[in-house]
Design a protein with these regions (language model features):
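Conserved, mostly hydrophobic/aromatic
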Residues: 25, 44, 127, 160
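Glycine-rich, proline-tolerant flexible connector loops at the mouths of alpha/beta enzymes
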Residues: 50-94
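Active-site beta-loop-alpha junctions enriched in small/polar residues
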Residues: 27-29, 57-59, 119-121, 139, ...
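N-terminal amphipathic alpha-helix/helix-capping segment at the start of soluble metabolic enzymes
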Residues: 1-23
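Catalytic domains of carbohydrate-active enzymes, especially glycoside hydrolases
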Residues: 39-58, 130
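Active-site beta->alpha loop and helix N-cap motifs at the rims of alpha/beta catalytic domains
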Residues: 78-144, 152
Length: 171
């Protein structure tokens, strides 16, 4: 099997002979504060990142208090001190879709790529023209209908494999 060598994300060539593509994974570390999100974009650029990446999800579509409470260890060590439920925390700290235009403009101003990890196809609404690549989280590696839809968008896909096994990655 042969593979095409290299591709571009914006103006940056991604290839084995090139410098690594540095993604600042801001995710939800803005703590639900758009000003903090903007500050993190500028900090990412100052740190030498090529890209500022966020996560776009809606809490009610990826977490459930019922699901977490049914686990033997419903409060993992880092969640034991939370005063709110897992679903409430996710809802509070998600990247709000109404922030998209501001985040995209801030990335342009900082001269850094904007990227996201969408957790549903609707997350791409309104930002498809502003991303030059899409990152898929490893938890979605076996979510075939989602991957097929994303692959039809015509953008390079960075597919995480951390929460998968070898069979997941080759099928």
């Amino acid at each position: 099997m042969t593979y095409k060598s290299g591709f571009h994300i914006g103006s940056k060539k991604i290839d084995i002979a090139e410098k690594p593509y540095f993604i600042a994974d801001i995710a939800a570390n803005h703590d639900g504060d758009i000003e903090r999100a903007k500050d993190l974009i500028y900090l990412a650029k100052t740190s030498g990142a090529d890209c500022a990446k966020f996560q776009h999800f809606k809490a009610d579509s990826i977490v459930s208090d019922v699901g977490f409470s049914s686990l033997d260890n419903s409060k993992m060590s880092h969640q034991a001190s939370w005063k709110k439920s897992v679903a409430e925390i996710y809802d509070q700290y998600h990247t709000k879709r109404e922030w998209n235009d501001v985040l995209i403009e801030t990335c342009k101003d900082a001269d850094i790529e904007f990227m996201t990890t969408p957790y549903d196809i609707d997350a791409m609404d309104g930002i498809l023209d502003s991303v030059n690549a899409i990152k898929i989280g490893s938890g979605d590696i076996t979510y075939t209908p989602f991957l097929k839809k994303i692959s039809k968008l015509g953008k390079p896909i960075l597919l995480a494999t951390g929460a998968s096994n070898i069979e997941d990655t080759i099928t």
